From Swiss-Prot:
Annotated LRR repeat ranges: 41-64, 67-90, 92-113, 114-136, 138-158, 159-181, 182-204, 206-226, 227-250
Tissue expression remark: Widely expressed across tissues, with the most abundant expression in spleen, testes, thymus, intestine, and blood. Expressed in macrophages.
Annotated region described as Disordered, given as residue ranges: 1-35, 329-528
Subcellular localization, as worded in the UniProt entry: Cell membrane
The species this protein was found in: Mus musculus (Mouse)
Biased composition regions of type Acidic residues, renumbered to the chain: 346-355
UniProt-recorded name of the protein: Leucine-rich repeat and calponin homology domain-containing protein 4
Bias-annotated ranges (Basic and acidic residues): 330-345, 357-371, 385-418
GO biological process, one term: positive regulation of toll-like receptor signaling pathway
Phosphoserine: residues bearing it: 279, 281, 304, 307, 309, 313, 432, 511, 513, 517, 521, 586
Lineage: Eukaryota, Metazoa, Chordata, Craniata, Vertebrata
Tree of life domain: Eukaryota
Induction summary: Expression is inhibited by LPS.
Amino acid sequence: MAAAVAGPLAAGGEEAAASVSLPGSPGLPGSRSAERALEEAVATGTLNLSNRRLKHFPRGAARSYDLSDITQADLSRNRFPEVPEAACQLVSLEGLSLYHNCLKCLNPALGNLTALTYLNLSRNQLSSLPPYICQLPLRVLIISNNKLGALPPDISTLGSLRQLDVSSNELQSLPVELCSLRSLRDLNVRRNQLSTLPDELGDLPLVRLDFSCNRISRIPVSFCRLRHLQVVLLDSNPLQSPPAQICLKGKLHIFKYLTMEAGRRGAALGDLVPSRPPSFSPCPAEDLFPGRRYDGGLDSGFHSVDSGSKRWSGNESTDDFSELSFRISELARDPRGPRQPREDGAGDGDLEQIDFIDSHVPGEDEDRSAAEEQLPSELSLVAGDVEKPSSSRREEPAGEERRRPDTLQLWQERERKQQQQSGGWGSPRKDSVLKRGIRAAGAGASAPSTQATCNGPPKSSTTQLGVSGGQGAPTPPPTSQDPLPVSGPVTAPVPRPLGSIQRPNSFLFRSSSQSGSSPSSPESVLRPRPFPQEKELISQLRQVLESRLQQPLPEDLAEALANGVLLCQLANQLRPRSVPFIHVPSPAVPKLSALKSRKNVESFLEACRKMGVPEADLCSPSDLLRGTAQGLQTVLEAVILVGGKAPLPVQPSSGLGGFLLFYVVFMLLLYVVYTRLLGS
C-alpha cells in the first residue's frame, strides 16, 4: 500500500513547497514544514497542508512516508488548479477539504475514494458537478461560492447525504431529483437565482432550510408538512405568499399561514398528512453541527482569490476546516443507539404536529401556564386514595393526556368537585350533565368484576363491550347523592368516542377537542344548556349589548364574551377611554390566547370598578371566561348602573294580577258614573 501511494507522488514534476515558509515561522524552509506535516499525518491520521500557497502536492517529501491510513486531509487555502492525484489515491480518506483553491474542474480519480463522507469544494471556480461525485457515499457536500449553473440529475444517488450547501452559485432551479434525498437534514441554497422551489421539498425531513437572497415570490403550501424544521431563513426575497408582515413574525406564523392556505384551496390538512414521509429517527441539529450557530451573519465583504476574480463571501458556514468539521464521519462510525420506545406503543409517525403554534414556543407556554392557574394543582378523588400516574405519563403533553380514556373520569370528577365547592350558579346542572355523559358511555357495558374499596388496595376492573343476556346485571346509574365510583388506578369504560360525551364547561376540554360531531364550533357542543332564568338573562343581555354596540352578536353569547373584546368595547361605549388597551384577534391568529383573553376580562372588571359598580356585584375573571350566569349578570348590572337604559330582570309579582283587576274595575265605575251624569 505504501508503494501504491508513493508511486504517484514521485511520478514527476517540480516540488513547489521547497521555497515556501510556514506561516509564522519565516526562517523555516517549506520542505521542512511539509515534512513535519507528513510526520504528524502518519502519527494522527490527519493530513493538514492548509494555508501554504501550494500549487502542487509535495511529492518528494511524501515519498518516504506511509499515507495509506490517512482518514482526514485538509488542503484548503492553497492554489491547486486541480485536485492532486496523490490525494485521490488515499483510499482510506473519509474527509477532504479543498476549500479556497483555484479548481476549475475535478479529477475523475476522486471516484476511487470509496470511504469519503465529507467533501468541501467551496470557494473555487467550478461550473458543473460531475456525475462520479454523486457515486461517493457522501454525508456532507459543500460546493458554495462557485459558478454552478445547475445540479446534475444524478444527485438523487446520494442516498446518505445529510447536508448540502450550494449557496452563492448561479442556480436558476432545483432538480426534482433533489427531493428524493430522504436523509437530507440541511439544505442551503442561499444567494442564487432561484425563482421557485419544488413542492416535493415538503416531503424531506429537513431540520434547516436557507433559501434567502433569491427571487422566490411564493413558498409552496406543501412546506407545512416540514414537521422537523427548526431553522428557516428566507430574507431578501420578493415574497408575496405568505405576505411580508407574516414572514416578519417568524417561522410559526409562516407555517400557520401555509396550513390555513392549504385549507382555503380545498387541500384539507388531513389529505396532506398521509403524504408525509414514514416515521424515521430525526437527527438533531446539535448532533450534526456541534458548536455551530445558524446566525446567517455576513463577513467583511469581498474576498479575492489567486485567479483575480472577486465574489461575495457571505454566509460561508464552513470556511474553517477543523476537527469539528469531520463530526459527520464520526457519526458514521459511531451511530446513535436505538431510540427508547414509548410506553403506550405509539411511534413517531403517529404523532402529527398539525398546529405549529402549540409547541416549542416559550411565549405560548406562558399563555398556557397563565390559563392553568385557575386549576387545582392536584387531582382529588372521592373514593379514597388512588395511585398517582407514573412520571412518564406526566411527561406527556397535556392535550394528549386529556384525550386518554383512563384519565377522562379523573378530569370529570375534578370538575364536578370544583363546581360543588364554588357553589356557583349552574353547578347542579353540570353534575347532571356529567352523570348523563358517563351513564351514556357505559350503556353497553356490563358491571365490572371488582370494585375498589375505600380502605383496601386498588384493584383492576375489566369492562366487557356489549351486553350478554343473563350474564351480569347492568351497572345502576349513580344517584345525585353518591359519588362517582373509581375502580383501579385510573381505568374507566369508554365504549364510545370521547367527542360524543357531554363534558363540563371548562377550557381544558375546549382545548382538547379538535373537531365536533356537528358543523358548529366544538365549544358549543361542550357548553351545557342554560336554565330558563339563564336563557332570559342571556336574551335580555343580548338586546342591551346589540343596542349599545350597534352590531349583531353570535348565537353563543357566552362564548363571544369569553375573549373580553366585546366587554372592553362595551366599557368604552359606556365611558370613553375606560379601557385604554384591548387585545384583538389578528387575521393570522383568529383566536386569542388564554392569557390575552384574561387580560381583556380583567381590564373590563377594572373599568367597572372605576364606573362605580359595587365590588359585591362583580364576578371573578374565571366566571366571564367560562361564561357562567354570574358573569353575565355582572355585565348586565354594569350596563344598568352606568347606562340606565335596561331594566333589571325582575320576577313577576304575585299581587300584580289583583292590582290590574282593581284598576280595571275602578276605571269601569268611573265610566259608568260619568255616563249617568251626562244622561241626567
